[in-house]
Amino acid sequence: MKKKTILSCISCAVLMLLTACSNDDITPTEKSKVDATKAIEFKVDFADYNSEQQVDMTRTGGKGEEAVQQTIDLGNGIVAQCTLQRDTTRKSKAAPTRLLENDTYTMLAYDPVTHALKGEVTGTVTWGVFTPTSSNPSIILAPGTYEFVLYNSKFTRSGNNLTVTRANAGEAYLGRTTYTVTAAPIKQSVAFTMKHVGASVKVKLTGYMDFTGVTGTLSSVNSTAVPGSSTYDASTGTWTTGTGAAMTANTTFNGSWETRYYSETYTAITNDGTAFMPSTDVSKLKLTFTGGNIYKINMAGASLTFNPTSTLKLDANGAYVLNVKLMYHFLYLMSDGSRGFIEETTYGGGTKTPIAVVVSQSKHLAVALEDANNGNPCVWSTLDPHYVQYNKSAKDDAKDLLTLCNGYSETWDASASIDNTTVKGTSTNFPAFKAAGDYTPTLPSGVHLTGKMVGKKWHLPSIGEFMVAYSALGFAKLSDATTYSGNLNGLYLDWYSSLADVAFTQVGARMWSSGFSPGKYYHSSSELTDSSFPHRAVLQTYSPKNHAYRLWFAYHSNWDGYVRAFINYDE
C-alpha cells in the first residue's frame, strides 16, 4: 500500500511538471502581445508647409537651389519677370489644427520586412492624440518593430493603396513612423508628424504702380499636363503619380496695401494657394489674367507660362510663391537712331546700345540717360540775372508753360531769342543751354553714333517737355497742375518716381528722380513773366525716394541747376 502511494505521488508530480512545461511553450507568447491602442499613446502633430526645407531659399531642380529668373513679354506693353520661391510665410497653427482634428483618421500597422498588414483601426485626433473609435478598437501586436501609417478621410483606400485626387490634395494629410513595440508593462508613446500630401502655389505680383481689381486663373497648359491624382502604397511607403488631367483654378488677388505714390514697389498676392499633386512640373502651369489694371493697361487676356531652363517639380508638403514682377516696357532710342525695348539692348541680351528713353513717339521726343555737363550744375545765364527777358515765348500765365514743347527752338533758333541773334545752344552766356547742346552720350568702347543719330542736336527741354517725360515715365497727371487754382510756384505733383528710375537703371544709368538729398533742380528752357520781371522755370526731383516732383519759377537766372538734355529723333 505504501509503495502504491509513493508511485501515485510521483505520477502526479510528473504530470504537473509536464503541464508546466507545456504552458511555458505556449502561454508566454500570448501574454507578451500588446494591444497597441491601449499600451501606446499615439501623439499627432500637424506640420507646416516646408517644415523640412530651408524656407529662406528658392529652388530650381533641387531643394535649396536659387531659382533662375525668366523674362516673358506679355505682349501688352508689360514684361513679366518670373521666379518660383518657397513660401516663407508662417501661419498660425491653432485654428488649422482645430479644423484638422474635426476629421476621421485611420491607422495601419505593417511588418517592415514582409510589408504584411498587422492591424488597423479608425479614430479621431483630439488635443494632439489619436483615439480609436471603431467597433474593433484594437491592434494586437507581438513585441517587435513596426511601421505605423496614419491618414485622414481625404484618401480613397483599396487594400494597401491610398489614393488622393488633386481636388483633395490641399486637405489630405499623411504620417508614417517606425516604432519598436516592447512587452514591458509601461505606457509607450509613438509620434506622428502629419504632412500635406499636396503642394500649394500662390502667385505674387510686384510692380512699380499699384494694382486694381486683378483676377486670373492658374491652369494646366493642356488636358494631360498636370497629375490628377497620386496613390500611396502604405505597405512600402512609395508614391505613384496618376494620369494627367486638365485643371483650372480661379485666383483672386488682394489689392495693393501700399500707399499710392509713396512706395518703391507695390504688391498683390492671391488670397489662397492652389493645391497640386507632388511631382507636378511647373512648366505645365499657365497664369492668365482675367481682369485688373497696372500702368494704365488692362491686364485681361494677358498670360504667361513659367518655363524654366531645367525641370522644376513640386514637392509634397511644399508651399511656393510664383513671383511675377510686372515691368513697364520702356522704349529706348539706340545709338543707330532706331528704337527698341530692353531685350534689344546689350542689357537685355540684345546687341544695341541705348542712349535715351523715348517719352513721346508722336513728338519723336526722348530724354538722355545721364545728366549733361559731366553731371555738374551750372547757371541758366551769366547775363543780367534779374530784369531781362531772353525768350520770345515767355508766358504771363504759368499754366501756359505746361504744354509748351519748344525746347529745341529755344536752344537752337536765333529767332526764338529776344535779340533775334543769340543761339543759346552755342553761347557761353547761357551755360545750361550750351551744356545741353554739347551733350554727347557716353558710349562703350568701339560703339559710335551712326545712321540718323550722326549730327543730331540735343536741347534744353521746356517745361512742357518735362511734363511729357514725367507723364510717360512716372504717370504724372498733368491735370493736377492745369486745374490747380493756386500759385503753381512750389507746387508738388505726384508721380511714381521709382517706376521712372527703372527706365534708367535697367540700362545701366543712374536714377533720375531719386537718390539725391534734398533733391535735384533741373533747368528748363522756359521763362515766366507774371510780374515786372521774368522768372526761369526750374523743376525739382524731390527725394530721397519721395513721391513728388516740384515746380519752381526761379527769381534769378544765375541759380545753379542740373541739365538733362532731350532730343527730337527722326523716324
Predicted segments, located by residue:
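GGW-centered surface loops in extracellular recognition modules
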Residues: 313-375
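C-terminal, surface-exposed recognition/capping segments
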Residues: 464-571
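Extracellular/periplasmic catalytic domains that process cell-envelope and extracellular macromolecules
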Residues: 141, 195-196, 358-361, 450-454, ...
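Sec-type signal peptide cleavage vicinity
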Residues: 2-8, 18-332, 352-354, 385-414
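Short aromatic-cysteine micro-motif
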Residues: 353, 359-459, 463-476
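Short consensus segments that form the blades of beta-propeller domains
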Residues: 93-99, 448-452, 553-556
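A motif-centric signal for short, conserved binding hotspots located
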Residues: 272-275, 433, 437, 441-447, ...
